[in-house]
Amino acid sequence: MQFKVSNVNKKRNLSAQIALVRNETPSDENYGLLDYSGHYTYSTRSTDSKQEQNLSPSLRLFGNFNIGKNQTLEFTAKGSYTQNDYTRQYTENENNSLSDVKEDLYSFNFSANYNIKLQHQNSFGIDIRHYHNITSSTYAGDYSSWQHLWTGESMFMLNYSQRFGKHFTMILRPGLSWMNYKLHTEDVRRYCSLKTSSRFSYQFNKKQQLALTADAGVNQPDISYMNNVDQTVDFLQIKRGNPFLDDMQLYNISLLYNGVFGKLNVVGGPGYSIYTHNVSPIYYLE
């Protein structure tokens, strides 16, 4: 459900939007037949039953202002609340496991963008953004726990674009990212890193283009990975979070060709990505 109002004239574009999203999975059941071997050899049936529902109201405010012949100023603010309820029941014969999670997520983000068109087929802009999330999760069932995580990221970016002739375009977006997050009972963690996005494109004609892109950035782990919780997978495995995860750093470079031949659209090219401190599962015996 969504409701939007706007006011538009030559000097400004203002809008406000209220939305409500609700999702529900009343029942999702999977049945299996398990064969155990080793010290004990036997067969058993398993049932994995899940129920999930989500409710999320949100408010978004937007304003775009023409402050000169070639200058624009744009603001966006959005706040949302999400309530997630998740229940999982797992059984093998007479053995029963229950996990019940109730999560409250508060999210706020703000952005301000200034852009000016210059005289030589180029433009310059400044982009300021902030993202803030607060998550509280209550776990019940096999393991009881309360987890609270807040994360925040502030970014400052410069935008510069330059067109050379009719075919070549360059876009540069260097910037900085200041990231903070804290899990309940743990120390605050702070990271400052470079953030950039660059694109160089050559347009052969109206239907063919070749583009080289290079990006570098960071990402924060969410509460589903950064926590102090044990959750039952089955009666041999336990899923355990890690409260000491670092921020994930991402580097990507790609060469992309896009061509239109009649009704056929061809898109493809090579790419290479590097992820450091990437979240991945680790299995070990206890």
Task: Explain the meaning of each model-derived region.
Residues 1-286:
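Primarily recognizes Gram-negative and organellar outer-membrane beta-barrels
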